Amino acid sequence: MDWLILIKAFLLGIVEGLTEFLPISSTGHLILAGDLLDFNDDKAQVFTVAIQLGAILSVCWEYRARLINVARGWGTRRANRFVLNLCVAFLPAAILGLLFIKTIKYYLFHPLPVAIALVTGGVLILWAERREHRIEVENVDDMNWKHALKIGCAQCLALIPGTSRSGATIIGGLLSGLSRKAAAEFSFFLAIPIMFAATFYDVYKHREFLHSDDLGMFVVGSIAAFISALIAIRGFIRYVSHHDFTLFAWYRIGFGLIVLLTAHFGLINWSAG
């Protein structure tokens, strides 16, 4: 295994972990980072999806007590409602993803569409934060299926790379009446089924690009994603308990504009597809 490949895998794993659960788009950052590292062929695209497994497992680990309680309480009203809400929120993006993911990847999985989505998403976050929030739900356990459906519909926007799955679901939660902490935590829980499904589906569909020699690359990337995601989750929950999402909105806008300006002036030769 080439050491350069392992270094790239490690760096991309850190990018995945740090950005997956923040409202700044992990897919967008991975596309841009892969382009800069010249790691953007078919195998690289499978890799960037597969290392999401490390990030997913970090959520499972961080909230292991909650997930174990749901499993032990299976059949109780509280556990059933929690699982129902996840299923309701999962379905809209899952259905649209199966129908349109090939078209989306062909046209939008490139640096410039990502940059536009970063800026647009940042503006939407600023708009959502400036709206008056009427909090109906302080805790994830107090959600109903209507809240979940609204968040699930918002998650469909995240099929566009650069939008951010966590950003779409968190803003959807805020607009549905959830507190910032409840919206962030439900976004984390919702990541488990949607990311497991997307990861295994994508890896299976592109299994011809995978070889046993690539195992080290995937292991390094996944471990880096797990550790960095765990750090990001804990820091993010502490942050949103006392702050809004304006900082992330301005980061998105600034980063997206940098990509667009460097492309316009030819400072970086971003790929066009």
Swiss-Prot record:
A single Gene Ontology molecular function, please?
A: undecaprenyl-diphosphatase activity
Q: Which reaction does it catalyse?
A: di-trans,octa-cis-undecaprenyl diphosphate + H2O = di-trans,octa-cis-undecaprenyl phosphate + phosphate + H(+)
Where found in the cell? Answer: Cell inner membrane
EC numbers for this chain: 3.6.1.27
Report the main location listed first in the record.
membrane
Q: Which regions span the lipid bilayer?
A: 4-24, 43-63, 82-102, 108-128, 183-203, 217-237, 253-273
Q: Name one Pfam family in it.
A: BacA
Q: Which GO terms describe its cellular component?
A: plasma membrane
Which GO annotations describe the biological process of this protein? cell wall organization; peptidoglycan biosynthetic process; regulation of cell shape; response to antibiotic
What keywords would UniProt list here? Antibiotic resistance, Cell inner membrane, Cell membrane, Cell shape, Cell wall biogenesis/degradation, Hydrolase, Membrane, Peptidoglycan synthesis, Transmembrane, Transmembrane helix
The enzyme's main class, written as a single word, is: hydrolase
InterPro entries, A to Z: UppP (IPR003824)
Kindly give the membrane topology term recorded for this protein: Multi-pass membrane protein
The entry's family comment says: Belongs to the UppP family.
Functional note: Catalyzes the dephosphorylation of undecaprenyl diphosphate (UPP). Confers resistance to bacitracin.
| Further details from the record | Bacitracin is thought to be involved in the inhibition of peptidoglycan synthesis by sequestering undecaprenyl diphosphate, thereby reducing the pool of lipid carrier available.
Return the protein name.
Undecaprenyl-diphosphatase
Q: Which organism is it from?
A: Nitrosomonas eutropha (strain DSM 101675 / C91 / Nm57)
Q: What is the lineage of its organism?
A: Bacteria, Pseudomonadati, Pseudomonadota, Betaproteobacteria, Nitrosomonadales
